[in-house]
A protein has these predicted regions:
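Short amphipathic alpha-helical "recognition" segments used for binding
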Residues: 9, 142-144
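A hydrophobic, small-residue-rich beta->alpha segment in the mid-to-C-terminal subdomain
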Residues: 144, 150-159
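Short, well-ordered alpha-helical microsegments
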Residues: 13, 147-148
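Surface loops and adjacent helix of pleckstrin homology
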Residues: 66, 130, 142
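N-terminal strand-loop-strand beta-hairpin
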Residues: 1-125, 156-193
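Short, surface-exposed beta-strand-loop junctions and turns on beta-sheet-rich folds
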Residues: 69-72, 133, 145-146
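A contiguous pocket-lining binding segment that forms or flanks enzyme active sites
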Residues: 128-134
């Protein structure tokens, strides 16, 4: 299934929330996410712009396969055309991680982020905070037309929308996630070579 979402970088979270409130959007909540990202030895999924993500959202745990579509660069200089995403809800973060390791996958890295979620009808607006990155806005909707509508409602410049992963945002900021085994708000631990 294609994930339909765009990102706007280097946003002012307070101004975006004021705009969202003025449009009648509802604040859903503030979240702390922890995720473990997996690959096969030699990062074979990464070479296909894909990964397996296990994410604890507090109220649910989601296992996802994600793959960037229409990839032309890995450094954020160009947008992708979309994202393939297949998700299942699982009941136990640690047991699921153990299962993935037992079928031959390896830890790619562990990371954390914080998110403020707003919703207007069927459009989700996520203000994301990641270690060492400026806040950014992610808009997800059921269609590209709805994305365009959301961009217009917020008065954002459509030319500023990006279709790419957080991995690419880190690359744009001179950080290669593959160099790290752990990326949190408290520490960034380099991968052992």
């Amino acid at each position: 299934m294609e994930e339909i979402e765009v990102k706007f970088l280097d946003i002012d979270p307070e101004k975006i929330q004021e705009k969202l409130k003025s449009t009648g959007a509802n604040k859903i909540g503030e979240y702390f996410y922890r995720r473990q990202v997996f690959d096969y030895p030699g990062f074979t999924l990464d070479k296909k712009a894909a990964w397996v993500r296990l994410r604890d959202e507090g109220d649910k745990i989601i296992l996802s396969f994600k793959q960037r579509l229409g990839t032309t660069s890995h450094d954020g200089t160009t947008s992708d055309i979309g994202m393939k995403e297949v998700e299942v809800i699982v009941s136990d973060f640690n047991k699921t991680a153990e299962l993935l390791l037992n079928i031959g996958m390896i830890y790619k890295f562990y990371e954390e982020n914080k998110r403020i979620r707003w919703k207007k009808e069927d459009i989700e607006f996520d203000i994301d905070f990641w270690p060492k990155l400026n806040p950014f806005l992610e808009i997800e909707a059921p269609s590209w037309e709805k994305i365009d509508e959301a961009v217009k409602i917020l008065g954002l410049n459509p030319a500023d929308k990006k279709i790419f992963s957080t991995f690419q945002i880190y690359k744009m900021n001179g950080i290669n996630e593959l160099d790290y085994s752990r990326i949190t708000f408290d520490e960034m631990i380099k991968r052992e070579q």
